[in-house]
Amino acid sequence: MWTVPVLFWVLGSVWFWDSAQGGTIGVNEDDIVTPGTGDGMVPPGIEDKITTTGATGGLNESTGKAPLVPTQRERGTKPPLEELSTSATSDHDHREHESTTTVKVVTSHSVDKKTSHPNRDNAGDETQTTDKKDGLPVVTLVGIIVGVLLAIGFVGGIFIVVMKKISGRFSP
């Protein structure tokens, strides 16, 4: 009688054995040193097509790694990356991009004296501003979890019916 639950437990746990093994861990990004050329620039890589700055200040004596913050010489001579324009965009597009702003959804609620903090002296016409949060990620996560649980139950139910049918104990 105990063989069927043990069989279900073993077959159900086989699916998790492969994911429990874990993946291989490669070299950390902090340990990779990008060699710099004479002017401190590295040619673009195949994967990013972006020019990156090399390590110009040498290695840090205490850690043996390249510094992450640009030196004072680099800050004074190079403009920030955000201010550089590409050949594909014109000055008009750049100015238009700077003038656009992102609008947050803000709601206002009036605050009554009854609902305000007792130690605070509030006027009756004061408003409280709050940012409205988007609930879509939470709903999506709950939907995925419920869907996975229903799928496991559905597949388990089919498996139980098939096992009963094979053993001869199933009578519709």
UniProtKB/Swiss-Prot annotation:
List every stretch annotated Requires for interaction with MSN and EZR: 164-165
Q: Where is the composition biased (Basic and acidic residues)?
A: 72-81, 90-99, 110-132
Result when mutating S167D: Does not significantly increase cell motility. Does not significantly decrease cell growth
Q: What induces it?
A: Down-regulated by treatment with puromycin aminonucleoside. Up-regulated during progression to highly aggressive tumors and during epithelial-mesenchymal transition (EMT).
Consequence of gene loss (knockout)? Mice die at birth of respiratory failure due to a low number of attenuated type I cells, narrow and irregular air spaces, and defective formation of alveolar saccules. Knockout Pdpn mice neonates are smaller, and approximately 55% died during the first postnatal week. However, approximately 20% survived, had normal weights and life spans, and are fertile.
User: GO terms for CC?
Assistant: anchoring junction; apical plasma membrane; basolateral plasma membrane; cytoplasmic vesicle; cytosol; external side of plasma membrane; filopodium; filopodium membrane
Q: Which UniProt keywords apply?
A: Cell junction, Cell membrane, Cell projection, Cell shape, Developmental protein, Glycoprotein, Membrane, Sialic acid, Signal, Transmembrane, Transmembrane helix
Q: Which domain of life is it from?
A: Eukaryota
Name recorded for this polypeptide: Podoplanin
